[in-house]
Amino acid sequence: MIAWLLVPATFLLGSISFAWLAGKAKGVDLREHGSRNLGATNAGRVLGKGWGFAVFFADVAKGLFPVLIARVLAEQHPDSSLGQLPIATAAAAILGHSFTVFHGFRGGKAVATALGVLCGLVYKVAAICLGSWILVWAIGYGLFRLKPGNAVGPASVVAALVMPFAHLLTFPDPWGLLNIPLTLFLFLVAALVIIKHRSNIAKLFQRQDQAPPPAA
């Protein structure tokens, strides 16, 4: 039972907004600047690329390491009730980040933390999602001339769409009795990420994210 305390602890860790802390260090409240989102993209947009990358890796870490700890605990006690501890811990990390208790349940869009969770749960799916994210970002920026920061939204949505289907293709028996929780979890994470990016999708269709043409 003590091991299950990892779940609420992870929720509290996930609720720590590294984007807000980075903004605080620079004397800026990111909730009032840029996209007003407490995430790595907005941190990079408002504070600079270095801060954006720092927030990104910190958000990945708070999803990755608790899940790895949960997996170790579950594997050490295979006959106990800890079989679903990694998934519960993963859910706590993502929910904590997305609905942080420290900022009125207004958190980030869960992309970086979800990547960390995927790396800990299903690394093949993480690699496929990351590859699809990079490809779509490059197409958006290079071909459709989206601003670098604004190409992140479409890339994240596509990666989220790819996530559950990549799992179905790469995971043995994804609909097996013991594997159904993981499969359903990935579909729910994909839905959450897409819902969190609904404003990005709306802006894309309105063509408000188009970069200006180069000067003659």
Predicted regions and their residues:
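Helix-coil boundary and interhelical linker segments in multi-pass alpha-helical membrane proteins
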Residues: 1-6, 67-88, 119-127, 168-184
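C-terminal ends of transmembrane helices
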Residues: 19-24, 94-106, 136-149, 197-204
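Interfacial segments of multi-pass membrane proteins
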Residues: 44-47, 70-74, 92, 111-145, ...
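Loop-to-transmembrane alpha-helix initiation sites
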Residues: 127-132, 149-160, 176-186
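Cytosolic, membrane-interface loops and tails of multi-pass inner-membrane proteins
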Residues: 20-52, 107, 198-216
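Multi-pass membrane catalytic core of lipid/isoprenoid biosynthesis enzymes
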Residues: 45-71, 106, 135
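Short, non-helical or kinked segments that cap or interrupt transmembrane helices
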Residues: 29-39, 102-115, 147-159
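N-terminal signal-anchor transmembrane alpha helix
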Residues: 1-26
